[in-house]
Amino acid sequence: SAKVYRPENIVADMFTHTDSTHANVVCGDFMLHLDAHGGYKRLLRHSDQIVGEVKRQIENKYIDQLKLRSYLPQMCVRLNMGHDNVFTRMMQRKGFDLASAFIDMDTSPIDGINGVVKLDSLIANGVQLDTIRVNLKSDSLRTDFTGQIRNNRHNPQYVFNALFGGTFYERGLYFGTRVLDAKERVGVALGLKASMESNGVMLSVGGRQDPILGYKKFSVNKNNYVLFSDDQRISADIKLRADDGTSVQVYSNDSTEALQDLTLGISNFELSKV
């Protein structure tokens, strides 16, 4: 027999004028509220301007946060979503699932991006993440972010607690993370800095503390780097060494005429502990 589908009630209060856009949408336990200055055409123009400015800054190897911020719309978005609504069921048909979601975000050309994102029991491609939290905070000079991805002891796949944070600054990004196992032991702790250079993008390992990989603390050479050059070459000089002799090295021979000469050296490293 044919299957009968009964659509749920969707209550929507939406309008857009030249000076404002407003939306209230309720469907089951899905609730969305949006208020923005300017009509929808102006909001689309903001989006195009941001994309264009990002491309321009990447091409010119710099990050001008204030310039990017000037294109942000004056907007607030509030989203509360549970498990009993048509939008969650649409996600399920695509192989995703979610117990709940909460977003409280404000954007402004003066104050930047500020807000929080909370997701619970997200399932994507068969992988379950119990808790996801992201916080964004902007001041007059920069934008900071902190967050957490955690699987509790009842997770059927992996139990861990990953904490991360970072900062967008003038010429790049700093990102740091600590990953704890089910026994609250730090298995990985790493700080990475990405910076725009005149000839490419440079990554370096560093932070307030020495990196930890596979539960071992490593020292790292002071001027370490990996440079992804505009000419498609990779240059590197990273030396990680633990007290027990475990070491990881990545280095390049930039004097060769070969398209690429990159060497990875690993000594006494137990990959199963990472």
Please place each PLM-identified region on the residue numbering.
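Interface amphipathic segments
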Residues: S1-V274
